Amino acid sequence: MFDGYSIRAKQVLFLARLESGARGAEMLDLDDLLTGLIIEDQNVIPSALARLGMEGQFMGSPEHHAFLPADTATNVLENIHQSHPRSQPIPHSTDMPISSDLGEILAAASELRKELQSKEVTPLHLFAATMRRSHSGIQALRNKGITEEGVIRAIRKEDLG
């Protein structure tokens, strides 16, 4: 299902699964994806994994510059973490379904990859597809000047270089 995804995009989805399981959710949703995107974007995967109880060596992702300003990323993450009730964590080994919203976002990211003729789906494709949604975390990003058009410009720049 994720053959056309970059290593970084797969890491985002892995982080989304860990975040969802940590809060005891029944399925992965937009907040989990947004959390995974921000953690990966800000290059804080090792500390997030430690917070989520994952031990061992982390195989790092390719070097990249953060797309989001650090203060914006921190504020959105804090709001997401505060807005969800916590219940019994779901074991890492348990498969979790994805919400229909998240399924639509993944499909939109794949379509965007084709439309832009990108080699693979990257975290920026996922960000762009996410920006089409009506959601408090997305609105917080818009309020800071992050737009779908801006993300698409960043994808085009990434594809060139």
Predicted features and spans:
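Histone-fold recognition with a strong bias for associated Lys/Arg-rich disordered tails
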Residues: 1-161
